[in-house]
């Protein structure tokens, strides 16, 4: 797959907080992904951005066309090339948005839906619905003195 252009910009998430959006342009179209920040942060959680959202955006937007031509991504496992290139230059949220956009482009390149591309021909199974029942931690505000001490 030939990537013609990669572009990043700042958008706002559902809580009106800034986050990153990355678009990847190929011959098959434009593929866009974003990665909102969580409200709380675990002690083992990766940093969403290296130093700042704007620094990650600048790094992605300054990827030279010469470098894009060298990146040959045809399969899921070849995303390691992107990770090696971007490591120590962008944070986890930026990398997620970038790789998600590339995955969408790869799926389109093979004329598949994203779920079909990721399942690699394995039989279809219905997903199990997952949802929050208890909104504890930083999400439990508003219970007026009855906030749970834990977060699901």
Show which residues each predicted segment covers.
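Glycine/threonine-rich beta-strand-loop-alpha-helix active-site module
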Residues: 111-128
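Short, Gly/Pro- and small/polar-rich lid/capping loops
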Residues: 1-19
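Acidic, glycine-rich active-site loops and adjacent beta-strand->loop/helix elements
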Residues: 12, 37-39, 120-124, 134
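Short helix/loop capping segments that flank catalytic or ligand/cofactor-binding pockets
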Residues: 30-32, 43, 141-143
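Metal- or metallocofactor-binding catalytic centers and their adjacent structured scaffolds
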Residues: 36-112
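Glycine-centered tight beta-turn/hairpin loop motif at sheet-sheet or coil-to-beta transitions
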Residues: 26-28
């Amino acid at each position: 797959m030939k990537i013609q252009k990669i572009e990043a910009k700042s958008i706002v998430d559902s809580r009106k907080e800034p986050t990153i959006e990355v678009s990847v342009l190929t011959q098959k179209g434009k593929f866009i992904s974003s990665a909102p920040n969580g409200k709380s942060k675990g002690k083992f959680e990766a940093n969403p951005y290296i130093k700042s959202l704007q620094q990650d955006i600048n790094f992605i937007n300054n990827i030279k066309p010469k470098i894009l031509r060298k990146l040959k991504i045809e399969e899921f496992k070849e995303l390691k090339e992107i990770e090696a290139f971007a490591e120590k230059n962008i944070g986890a949220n930026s990398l997620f948005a970038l790789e998600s956009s590339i995955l969408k482009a790869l799926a389109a390149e093979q004329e598949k839906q994203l779920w079909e591309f990721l399942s690699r021909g394995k039989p279809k199974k219905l997903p199990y619905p997952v949802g929050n029942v208890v909104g504890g931690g930083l999400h439990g505000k508003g219970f007026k003195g009855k906030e749970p001490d834990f977060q699901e």
